[in-house]
Amino acid sequence: MLKNVNRLILSICLVIVSACTTNDLEPTLANRITMVTSGDVSLVSKTYAWHQTMFSVHTKNTQDEEPLRELLRQSVNKVMAAKGYQQVAYTDSPQMLIGFGMALESEMSDTEILAKAGLVPGLSTHGVDKKLEKGSVLIAFFNPLVKEPYWRVLAQGFTEHNKSVDKRAAGFDALSKMMLSAIPSS
């Protein structure tokens, strides 16, 4: 009798457990981002200015390049101000310079990015919908007296290349916040 009760309980447990299913929640491709950083954030200083020559943007539509440049500058400025850093003019002898680069995969390959930046996150495009394109954003911090950056971060994600520039502001803010999360508050 006890064996029959144990078998019944075991059978019920097996039915209950086998009825349970799990779903892996994968982020949508549009939200997938990979990042790689290199350098020493302890060298970050209180005042900064924008690098005079490192601000390149490579897109399919050259008319979007200046608005995208300005969007990224604004987003980085917001993050840096929230962390207590002060932007100054280049002529006011900033303690550090911030530069950036941005490119779509159709305009610059991972091999080219690696050659220029020395970093590449290697986000795979296998099986990605053709309406999305891989984009890369590099942010680098420099000592004004040294040519090479002392800290840099490179992020890759997917973007809808047909999306208007004005609809990308929130995405730039979120990306800048994520990319600069390692920068300590001043």
Q: Where in the sequence are the language-model features?
A:
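C-terminal/domain-edge helix-coil "capping" segments
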Residues: T21-G39, D129-S136, F141-S186
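Extracytoplasmic/periplasmic, Sec-exported soluble proteins
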Residues: S42, K60-L72, Y90, D129-E133, ...
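Compositionally biased P/S/T/G-rich terminal and signal peptide-adjacent segments
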Residues: T28-S56
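A short, structured loop/turn motif at beta-sheet edges
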Residues: S38-K46, Q87-P94, F141-E148
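C-terminal motif of bacterial Sec signal peptides marking the signal peptidase cleavage site
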Residues: I16-A19
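Surface-exposed short loop/turn segments
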Residues: S93-Y150, Q156
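N-terminal segment of the mature soluble domain
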Residues: T47-E105
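Bacterial N-terminal signal peptides that target proteins for export
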Residues: M1-I9
